[in-house]
Curated annotation (Swiss-Prot):
Full protein name: Large ribosomal subunit protein uL2c
Ribosomal protein listed as a keyword: yes
Keywords: Chloroplast, Plastid, Ribonucleoprotein, Ribosomal protein
One CC-aspect GO term: chloroplast
InterPro entries attached to this UniProt entry: NA-bd_OB-fold, Rib_uL2_dom2, Ribosomal_uL2, Ribosomal_uL2_bac/org-type, Ribosomal_uL2_C, Ribosomal_uL2_CS, Ribosomal_uL2_dom3, Ribosomal_uL2_RNA-bd_dom
Annotated region described as Disordered, given as residue ranges: 225-252
Location in the cell: Plastid, Chloroplast
Length: 275
């Protein structure tokens, strides 16, 4: 992936950059793998806002992505690399030998025409999925399962990868992108390689409207609100928050407070915390 830098033709392009989409080989998605995606704009079934700063945005259709990789020992050919509006990574369309078509996350350096596999005894090559106990130490993996058969749940974002660092009995130890070190059952599947589109983090939107295209509404600071709207609000002119520590709009402690539940069921899996 490359980044296209815009010249200052207008105020909206002055600080703008975007992907050059050179890795995209097909513009229209596979119709059999599309589903409707309804926008709730952060509201629940009663119409109340449960997630702030959501609303608007371009209409999208969901692409069914195969996170389980459960078609074992059936070769698949990479037919195309496509854009997915629902995630920051690209997706690759696979044509299996038995005629089925599926999307997967597009790993870095996986090209159209490559042949990939899923299974226990498959080659250690980019795009192949296998149990963690068969992955050599030091190998970069992504789309890692937490429970065997459930499908990949972690290390799925663009440019991310985890590293297999140890094997001991029924567990495999991996180092996460956050530098957290944790244990995972050895029968969990993972895909070899790093997720592509790593330069997405270097893109500058350039104007507020591009945020709105993504369905993200403005975030307003509490200190500029009225007292009826936020605990930080009120005062004459530019005034401090008037409290010892910052709080959320509902009065709970914010900024620096640990949000992970104490005695969580998975605490025993974490060898070194990311914090």
């Amino acid at each position: 992936m490359g980044i296209r830098i815009y010249k200052s033709y207008t105020p909206g392009t002055r600080n703008r950059s975007s992907s050059d989409f050179v890795e995209i080989t097909k513009s229209k998605p596979e119709k059999s793998l599309l589903r409707k995606k309804l926008s709730c704009a952060g509201r629940n079934n009663r119409g109340l806002i449960t997630v702030r700063h959501k609303g608007g945005g371009h209409k999208q259709r969901y692409r069914l992505v195969d996170f389980k990789r459960n078609k074992l020992d059936i070769p698949a050919i990479v037919a195309s690399v496509e854009y997915d509006p629902n995630r920051n990574a690209r997706i690759a369309l696979l044509h299996y030998q038995d005629g089925e078509k599926r999307y997967i996350l597009h790993p870095k350096k996986l090209a159209v025409g490559d042949k990939i596999y899923s299974g226990i005894n498959v080659p250690i090559e980019i795009g192949n999925a296998m149990p963690l106990y068969n992955v050599p130490l030091g190998t970069a993996v992504h789309n890692v399962e937490l429970i065997p058969g459930r499908g990949g749940q972690i290390v799925r974002s663009a440019g991310t990868s985890a590293q297999v660092v140890a094997k001991d009995g029924q567990v495999v130890t991996i180092k996460m992108p956050s530098n957290e070190v944790r244990m995972i059952y050895k029968n969990c599947y993972a895909t070899i390689g790093e997720v592509g589109n790593a330069d997405i983090k270097n893109i500058r939107l350039g104007k507020a409207g591009r945020k709105r295209w993504l369905g993200i509404r403005p975030s307003v600071r509490g200190v500029v609100m009225n007292p009826c709207d936020h605990p930080h609000g009120g005062g004459e002119g530019r005034s401090p928050i008037g409290r010892a520590k910052p709080v959320t709009p509902w009065g709970k402690p914010a900024l620096g407070v640990k949000t992970r539940r104490q005695n969580k069921y998975s605490d025993f899996c974490i060898i070194r915390s990311r914090n």
